[in-house]
Amino acid sequence: MKFSLAISFFILMSLLFEDACAKEKSSKKGKGKKKQYLCPSQQSPEDLARVPPNSTSNILNRLLVSYDPRIRPNFKGIPVDVVVNIFINSFGSIQETTMDYRVNIFLRQKWNDPRLKLPSDFRGSDALTVDPTMYKCLWKPDLFFANEKSANFHDVTQENILLFIFRDGDVLVSMRLSITLSCPLDLTLFPMDTQRCKMQLESFGYTTDDLRFIWQSGDPVQLEKIALPQFDIKKEDIEYGNCTKYYKGTGYYTCVEVIFTLRRQVGFYMMGVYAPTLLIVVLSWLSFWINPDASAARVPLGIFSVLSLASECTTLAAELPKVSYVKALDVWLIACLLFGFASLVEYAVVQVMLNNPKRVEAEKARIAKAEQADGKGGNAAKKNTVNGTGTPVHISTLQVGETRCKKVCTSKSDLRSNDFSIVGSLPRDFELSNYDCYGKPIEVNNGLGKPQAKNKKPPPAKPVIPTAAKRIDLYARALFPFCFLFFNVIYWSIYL
C-alpha cells in the first residue's frame, strides 16, 4: 500500500514539473517573438474602421486594403523597370586562399507601382516614410547577388530597412547588407597583380518580359574614402555593365554588374619577402671571400642560406591558393633558392680542387720553381734544413751547433766516429741552436742577453691551395652578383 502511494506521488510530481517547464518555455518564446504585423488587406473591417479617417494610417490602409503583393505592377503589361544604386560602407580585402571579398552596402531599389499613388487629399510632403514592417505588404523585385557566397541583413537596433512611397507611386527601398562575394583571381603577376572583382545583381524568378534592372544615372555606386590594407581602389576604376543571362527552358533574366578594379600594393611584400630573400642571397656570397680551406665557416653559411630560402617558400605557399600556374613571387623565390644552392655547389667544386693530389703537387712544384727563380729554392733550401726534411734552420744556427758538437764530442775518448750522425737524426722541428750534440736542450741567448725558450717550434706551414681553387672563388665573386643583377633587370622589367 505504501509502495503504491509512493509511486503515485512520484508520477504526480513529474507531471507538475513537466507542466511548469512547458509554461516557462512558452513564456520565453512569447517574450522573444516580435509582435506580428497584419497588412491592411489582412485586417478585419472593424479594425480598419477604428482608424481616424483623415490620418496617414487611413490613407495607407486605403492604398493597401485591396493591394495584392503577389502580383507585380503593370501585370500583363510593360516590364517593371527597377533603378538600382549602391552605397558602399566598407570594403574588405580580397582573401587569396578563398578567392572572395566582403562588402557592407546600402542597396537601394526604386520602381513605380501605380497602385500606390497617394490620393489627392493627402497633404504633406511628396514622399511618405513608412515603417519597415510594412515592407512585407508590398510587391518587391526578387533581386539576388549572382556571385554571392553568404549574406545577412542587419537588425540592430531595428531592421535596417528604409521605405519611401512617393506621391506618383514610386517606391524606394534601402536596406543594409553584408555580403561575401566570390572573385576568381588571376595570380600570375602576384604580388604585382591587378584584380577585377564583380558584383552581379540578377532577377531570380522574373524574366526580362516582367522585370528589368537599370543602373541609376550618374554614379550608381558610391564609394567614399575607403582604404584597403593591400589594395588601392579608386572611383574612376569602377565599371558598369549588363550581364543579362539566358537559361535554357525559362528564358532571359535581367542582370546588371559592377566591376571593381583593385591594384595590389607591393610595399608589404617588398619589406616582408623581397628584401629579406635578397639579403640572404647576398649573405651566401660572403663564402667566396672566406679562405677555401675554412670549411667550418663556409659550409654552415651555405646551408643556412638554402634552408632560410626554403623556409620562406614553404611559408608563402601555405598562405596562397594552390594554383597550377607559376606566380611572379614563385619565380623570385625559386631564383633566390637556386642562387643560394649554387653558392653551396661552388664550394663543393672548390673542395674537389683543394683535395686533388695532382693539383696540390703541381702547386707545390710551381711554388718551388718560383722560389728557385728568386734564388731561394733548390740546393739552398735543402742545405738550410735538418736532414733534408724541409724544416727550416738558419745557416748560422747550423754552424754554431756543429762547432759545439765538435768541441764537446772530441773531448771524449770513447766517442765513436759516427756519433756526429745524431745531428742528422734530430726531430725535424728541433733547432740545432737549442740542443747540444746529444739532443739535450740548452739555453741560448737571443743576442740581447736574454735566454730564449727551450724547444722553440717554428710556426706551422701554410696549406698549399691550388691556383684552380682560388680562381674559382675569384670568378664567383664577379659572376654571381652579375648574374643576380641581370636576373633582377629582367624580372622587374617583366612584372612591374
Swiss-Prot record:
The keyword Disulfide bond applies. Subunit of heteromeric glycine-gated chloride channels. Plays an important role in the down-regulation of neuronal excitability. Contributes to the generation of inhibitory postsynaptic currents. GO terms for molecular function: extracellularly glycine-gated chloride channel activity; extracellularly glycine-gated ion channel activity; glycine binding; protein-containing complex binding; transmembrane signaling receptor activity; transmitter-gated monoatomic ion channel activity involved in regulation of postsynaptic membrane potential. Residues 1-22 form the signal peptide. Its main location: membrane. It comes from Mus musculus (Mouse). Glycine 1 binds at residues 108, 174. The modification Phosphothreonine is found at residue 391. It is a multi-pass membrane protein. It is linked to Defects in Glrb cause the spastic condition which is characterized by muscle rigidity, tremors, myoclonic jerks, pronounced startle reaction, abnormal gait and impaired righting ability. Neurons from the ventral horn of the spinal cord display reduced inhibitory postsynaptic currents. Likewise, hypoglossal neurons display a dramatic reduction in the frequency and amplitude of postsynaptic inhibitory currents. Residues 23-268, 316-327, 496 are extracellular. Detected in spinal cord, brain and brain stem, especially in the periolivary region, spinal nuclei, trigeminal nucleus, medulla oblongata, pons and midbrain. Detected in the inner plexiform layer of the retina (at protein level). High levels of expression in cortex, hippocampus, thalamus and cerebellum. Detected in spinal cord. This is Glycine receptor subunit beta. Keywords: Cell membrane, Cell projection, Chloride, Chloride channel, Cytoplasm, Disease variant, Disulfide bond, Glycoprotein, Ion channel, Ion transport, Ligand-gated ion channel, Membrane, Phosphoprotein, Postsynaptic cell membrane, Receptor, Signal, Synapse, Transmembrane, Transmembrane helix, Transport. Disulfide bonds join 183-197, 243-255. Residues 290-294, 350-471 are cytoplasmic. Residues 32-53 are annotated as: Disordered. Glycans are attached at residues 54, 242. Belongs to the ligand-gated ion channel (TC 1.A.9) family. Glycine receptor (TC 1.A.9.3) subfamily. GLRB sub-subfamily. Gene3D superfamilies: Neurotransmitter-gated ion-channel ligand-binding domain, Neurotransmitter-gated ion-channel transmembrane domain. Forms heteropentamers with glycin receptor alpha subunits. Heteropentamers with GLRA1 can be composed of two GLRA1 and three GLRB subunits, or three GLRA1 and two GLRB subunits, or four GLRA1 subunits and one GLRB subunit. Forms heteropentamers with GLRA2. Functional GLRB-GLRA2 heteropentamers contain four GLRA2 subunits and one GLRB subunit, although alternative subunit composition cannot be excluded. Forms a heteropentamer with GLRA3. Interacts with GPHN.
